[in-house]
Amino acid sequence: MILRRWKGFCLAAEEEALFPRGAEMCGEVFAPLVFLVRRDPLRARGLYPIRDLSELDEPEGIGCLTPSSPAEGEMAAFVRAHGAGVLNAAFSRAFSILQAWSAAKKDGLVLTLVGLGDVGGTALLALKLLGRELAKIQIFDPNRAQCQRYEMELNQVLSADGRTLPEVVICEEQDLFRCDLFAFTASRGVPGLDSKVQDVRMAQYEANRAMVGTYARMARQADFTGLFCQISDPVDHLSRSVFLQSNQKETGEFDFAGLLPEQVQGFGLGVMAARCAYYARQLGLDEDALRVYGPHGQGLVCANCCGGNYDAAISAELTEKTRTANLRVRELGFKPYLAPALSSAAASLLRLVRGQEHYGAVPLGGAYFGCVSRMTRFGPELRREALAPALRAELEKTYAALEAFEY
C-alpha cells in the first residue's frame, strides 16, 4: 500500500496512477485516511466511510447492511481506531467533493426548495419552524405568485423559543445550486383521487424523470458540491436517474463528470417507517424493534424485527398495510401528502444535517436502496446489523428488482 499526503489527507492506494497531482510522500499513516480505488462508476459508490478494513473490498449489495468480519494487521487496527474513507477516482470530481465535504458547515446552511405544491409547501412550513441549522431557504416554483406568497407569509412567523428562524427568499434560476442542499419536490402526473391506478408512485416516473433531468444537468453545469435531495415520487428510481443524467454529456454518452452517487439521496422511506410504527402500535408490536427497507412503494420491506424474532407473516402484514396506507387516505377524499412532507422530507433532512441516523435511499451498487444511514464527511455510513436469513432473502429480492429497473 502506497501512502501520500495531500491537502491534509493521508491517501492510500495500490497504484501510483490513482493519486492526484501534488500528493507527496509520507512515512506513516495518519488520520483522516482515505483509500483510493478505481471501480466501475455505473455500479460502484463514489465516496463512503468504513469502520473496518474488510469493508474496503466487500461486494456492493445487501451485505453492506450486515456486520463485516474483522480484518487483521496494523492497517486494520488503525482503521478500527480512527475510521477511514474510500474514494472512487473513476469520478472526475471525486477529489473536489472529498475536499468540499470535509470542510462542510454544520449550521448556517442554505437550502434550495424546488416545488411549492402540497408536499413542498408543507415541508417548507416545517423547515421554517424547525430548521435551526438553516440560515436561508431559497424557494423556486413556476408559479411566481406562490413564491411571493410564501416569502411574504413565512417571513412574518414568530419563533416559539426565541431562536432565529431561517429566512425564506425567492430564488432565481441561476442561483438554484448556490446552496448546500437542493431539495426537489416538484411533480407531474400525480393521479387524481378518482384514479384507479394502484401504484400511484410509479405512475409518475416518466414525467418526473424528464423534469428532474433538467435539474440534474444544471447541477452538473454548476459543479454542485452539495447534496441533491430527491423527494418527489418514485423517490428511489428518480434518485438513480438524477445520478445517471448528471453524468451524461449532451450526446448521452457517460463521462462521469457530474454528481457522485453520494451527492444524491432519496427521501421517501421516512414516512414508511412512520406508517409502519402506526400500524405496529395497533398490533401491539415493539416499535423499537421495527425495521423498514427498500423503495417508497412496491418492493417495500417492513419487519417486526431484523434478528432471531423475525416473523415473516407479521412482517408481510405490516408491509402491506404500510405500502397501501396512502390509498386509505385517498379513500377518504384527500391526497396523502402531510405525513410524507413531514416525515420523509423535513424530519429526515434535518436529521441528516445534524449527523443523526435517518431514513433515506442511498447508492448501493447499481441502485438506490432505502435504509438507515448517518451522513459523515465521507458520505453515508450505513447501519449494520445481523439479519434473519428470511429477511435478508426479501431484501435481496427487492434490491435485485431495483438494479434491474430500466432507468
PLM features: residue spans?
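Hydrophobic/small residue at the entry helix of a nucleotide-binding pocket
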Residues: 118-122
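Rossmann-fold NAD(P)-binding glycine/threonine-rich loop
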Residues: 17, 193-257
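Conserved N-terminal Rossmann-fold NAD(P) cofactor-binding segment
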Residues: 142-179
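Long, compositionally biased stretches enriched for glycine and/or charged residues
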Residues: 55-70, 281-407
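Short beta-strand element of Class I
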Residues: 134-138
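Rossmann-like dinucleotide-binding core of oxidoreductases
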Residues: 232-307
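Glycine/serine-rich phosphate-binding loop and adjoining beta1-alpha1 elements at the start
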Residues: 1-108
